[in-house]
């Protein structure tokens, strides 16, 4: 049933709060969805209300499992037809239950970015991904888990009386770019999440298998976060095929990958003490004997017959996720999908987060034309 815990700090406009309280205490359309108000400390300053959504999605085995999301509403009353919906696919935070973004303060970068989105009149739905915030551990970069977490969140929020328009656009950054495209890959235009009109992705890891193989090499360079990214990938591969991963880790790698299961990004990066991804495996040139095949099993996307426009952005100075294959991936999408518009925008001199921020004016233009 619906759970309501009104906190005035999380709902700042008195008349709106009373209307929202009436909405949240209305009977639910399904017993599998519950809502309440999130702590204001975990919200965006520009949001008039922050709502916690609990719903059912799929875990890494394809079984029904609980998931959580934050829904952030813009100031003012909804327009006729409801607020247009932006779905936020977040980047890497970790794979442990306690890393769920909806239960942590938002970063300064995200507060600024989504302050503009909310101020422009869009509601923001932000799934945590299954396993974050609901126990069980998140299967990192798992196409099924990420894609279903997003699509099922949209379907779930539609069972509530919150006034949202039918159309929605997904925005993803870094790992979230893969999550956003996972949702596009699994999207059914006749299903309960119908109305997807576009995707905007930045910091995309294109050609995942080869790019990760390069990241593991002893000669690789890049940000300090890369060893944590590598460990999270190895946790996901262990979940799929432990016998294909664990025997090929170094002594340090076994301890560090075990730590990755319970440690969020910043702390896990610090625990590496400057080591590179190569330190995790016995053979940095071949992290595991079936590495690229297993990465493909985990992360592969449908890239043909996609039904919606896609905007891709990248920074030329990105050292977290090298944009080596981004333009090539955009060319592939255009060739494979001649009936949609695929744009690739280059942000000179911008790093991983910088490209995300630099893309905001283009993203707002995309939202105006697709919502």
Q: Which sequence ranges carry the predicted segments?
A:
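Catalytic-loop region of hydrolases
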Residues: 2-4, 9-12, 27-78
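Short beta-strand element of the alpha/beta-hydrolase
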Residues: 68-70, 81-94
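Conserved alpha/beta-hydrolase
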Residues: 90, 95-96, 101-133
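C-terminal catalytic histidine-bearing segment of alpha/beta-hydrolase fold enzymes
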Residues: 283-294, 313, 320, 327-328, ...
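Primarily recognizes the serine-hydrolase "nucleophile elbow" in alpha/beta-hydrolase
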Residues: 155-224
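Accessory cap/linker subdomain of secreted extracellular hydrolases
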Residues: 202-303
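Alpha/beta-hydrolase active-site loop
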Residues: 140-161
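Short beta-strand/loop motif that positions the catalytic acidic residue
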Residues: 306, 311-318
């Amino acid at each position: 049933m619906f759970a309501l815990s009104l906190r005035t700090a999380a709902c700042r406009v008195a008349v709106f709060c009373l209307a929202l309280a009436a909405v949240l205490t209305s009977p639910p359309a399904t017993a599998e969805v519950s809502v309440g108000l999130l702590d204001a400390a975990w919200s965006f300053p520009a949001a008039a209300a922050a709502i916690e959504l609990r719903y059912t999605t799929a875990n890494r085995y394809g079984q029904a499992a609980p998931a959580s999301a934050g829904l952030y509403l813009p100031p003012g009353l909804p327009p006729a037809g409801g607020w247009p919906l932006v779905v936020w696919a977040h980047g890497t935070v970790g794979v442990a239950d306690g890393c769920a973004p909806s239960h942590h303060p938002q970063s300064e970068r995200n507060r600024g970015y989504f302050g503009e989105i909310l101020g422009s009149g869009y509601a923001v739905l932000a799934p945590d991904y299954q396993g974050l915030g609901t126990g069980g551990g998140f299967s990192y970069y798992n196409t099924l888990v990420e894609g279903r977490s997003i699509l099922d969140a949209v379907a779930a929020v539609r069972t509530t009386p919150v006034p949202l328009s039918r159309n929605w656009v997904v925005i993803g950054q870094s790992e979230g770019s893969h999550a956003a495209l996972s949702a596009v890959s699994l999207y059914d235009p006749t299903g309960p999440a119908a109305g997807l009109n576009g995707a905007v992705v930045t910091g995309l890891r294109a050609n995942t298998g080869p790019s990760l193989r390069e990241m593991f090499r002893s000669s690789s360079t890049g940000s300090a976060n890369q060893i944590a990214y590598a460990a999270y990938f190895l946790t996901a591969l262990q979940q799929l095929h432990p016998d294909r991963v664990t025997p090929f880790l170094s002594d340090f790698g076994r301890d560090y990958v075990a730590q990755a299961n319970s440690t969020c990004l910043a702390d896990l990066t610090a625990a590496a003490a400057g080591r590179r991804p190569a330190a995790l495996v016995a053979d940095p040139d071949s992290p595991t004997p079936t590495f690229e095949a297993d990465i493909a099993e985990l992360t592969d996307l449908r890239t043909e017959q996609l039904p919606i426009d896609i905007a891709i952005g990248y920074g030329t100075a990105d050292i977290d996720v090298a944009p080596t294959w981004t333009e090539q991936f955009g060319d592939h999408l255009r060739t494979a999908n001649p009936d949609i518009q695929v744009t690739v925008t280059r942000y000179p001199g911008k790093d991983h987060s910088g490209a995300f921020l630099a893309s905001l004016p283009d993203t707002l233009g995309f939202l105006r034309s697709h919502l």
